[in-house]
Amino acid sequence: MLFILILLLVVATIVSTAYLTEKGEALAVRTNYQKCHYDIVHENLPDLSDYHWLYDLLLGAFVAPYIFYYGTYDAGAVGSVWVWLVVCVFIFRCLTISVTIPTQTTHVKRDFGNWLKRHLTGTAHDLCFSGHVSFAFSLVLVGLHFGIISNRVLWFGLLACLGLFSAMSRSHFSIDIVMAVPIVMTFFDWTMCQSASKDTIFGGCDCAPDIITM
């Protein structure tokens, strides 16, 4: 199930890339090459960059259930999740040094906070994929899998709001948010399968698909 979903996402990515490339070239000509990319959210929804701080505040809502959770954590499960997060960070690092966005990001300036962003949690010119959405999606999947949270509609709805707001606040391009989903799902499935002593990444392991489809 998850393997089929990822294949569909790959096809959708190829088609959307071709479409957005064409739109981007037209936009570059129309604006005399002042803008050489096209983003469906940036071009059609309001600019909320002045409310960028709400982006981090909304992420805090995903952390809260873990702070107030009074149950017992399984040490093996926690170890598996840590491995999964490290793999995601490794993939993120690989992408940030190899994927260059077409225009300079205006929110990166040479002050202390953004210096940390460039050297530890992000870069000055590369944003793929969204760390906020990846982390929030990870918390939702872990919470549902281990019973820390239960309302799927609420949390996936809140996750969609976080993704939309991250694009509207100009923190990310839309593709950064979309790419976070298959990456997190793939490595969540892999780590849960490994913790359950499965031999394959997708075959025989139904932990991630159950969370998504139920």
Predicted region positions:
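Membrane-interface interhelical connector segments
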Residues: 105-121
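C-terminal TM-helix exit segments that contain a strictly Trp-centered aromatic cap at the helix terminus
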Residues: 17-25, 92-105
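Membrane-interface helix-boundary motifs at transmembrane edges
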Residues: 31-36, 69-81, 147-150
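Interfacial segments of alpha-helical transmembrane regions
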Residues: 63-99
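N-terminal transmembrane-helix/juxtamembrane module of multi-pass inner/ER membrane proteins
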Residues: 1-66, 108-109, 113, 209-211
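Non-transmembrane, juxtamembrane loop and terminal tail segments
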Residues: 200-214
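Alpha-helical transmembrane segments of integral membrane proteins
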Residues: 2-13, 80-85, 151-157
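Membrane-embedded catalytic cores of phosphoryl/pyrophosphoryl-handling enzymes
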Residues: 116-204
